[in-house]
Amino acid sequence: MNATALLIGLGPLLGWGLFPTIASKIGGRPVNQILGTSLGTLIFAAIFSMINGLAFPAGMDLFFSILSGVGWACAQIITFKCFTMIGSSRAMPVTTAFQLLGASLWGVFFLGNWPGATAKLLGAFALVLIMIGAKMTVWSETESAESAGIMKKAVLLLAVGEIGYWAYSAAPQATAIDGMHAFLPQAIGMVIVAVIYSAVVTIKGGEISPFIEAVSYKQIFSGFFFAFAALTYLISAQPDMNGLATGFILSQTSVVLATLTGIWFLGQKKTAKEMTVTIIGLVLILAAATITVMI
């Protein structure tokens, strides 16, 4: 692995690691966050496509690419809602664990991954590590019945959101184009969902329309971080860079940065014991991610 490949591989660490913290710091409601983030991603993707002269997909390639973006936006709305419930430092490890579980199970049952008894045994061990790690990251020394109920609700919501994240990663596999050509249509799908969601909130009334709130457009900045991470991951996963396996592992390190910056910069405090358990949980999740791609 050369220095250039390593730097590109660490792009998702910075982009996806800082994205949840920046989006939470800028503030606003989930509708503001998804609208701004999607617009930021669209701007980034459009500029990238124009600079590189990428042809715009058509037919089913376009459909599945847009569907991918729709899935991500739906899932991200749920994740943003969970940020308000339990904080990004707790939500991110859980949603990362669900994404790893979803991707692994999809690969085993539908793509023929992990052939042989040994591979399946190692894979099952990795999945157990993921679940243990996720549980450890949300552990609390003192938790009231009310906060425990909120946590359970958030975890269930994040599990539902995994359907959207699964569509985000699985839909492009049905196309005949690479990730860079799918990037702009994905962003269009994200904006479609964000605009519809914002319109529904506006029509329902009772709340300020997100279209006229400044915070919605401030969130464009957080969208640049998400888009940067998505693009550098696509480049990192190329065979002549880090390859899919190493690129994926490097990208998953973002959960560590997202969790720690949420604790340090958003006031999502943990006791010394909770911090120790959280870090161990993060290590288990990363170890499991490494196992799943090395089988």
Swiss-Prot record:
Residue spans crossing the bilayer: 5-24, 34-56, 63-80, 95-114, 121-139, 154-171, 183-205, 220-237, 244-266, 276-293
A GO MF term: carbohydrate transmembrane transporter activity
Location(s) in or outside the cell: Cell membrane
Lipid bilayer topology: Multi-pass membrane protein
Matching CDD domains: ribose_uptake_RbsU
Keywords: Cell membrane, Membrane, Sugar transport, Transmembrane, Transmembrane helix, Transport
GO cellular component, one term: plasma membrane
Role summary: Could be involved in the uptake of ribose.
Entries under PANTHER family matching the protein: TRANSMEMBRANE PROTEIN 144
Assigned protein family: Belongs to the GRP transporter (TC 2.A.7.5) family.
Protein name, UniProt field: Putative ribose uptake protein RbsU
Taxonomic source organism: Enterococcus faecalis (strain ATCC 700802 / V583)
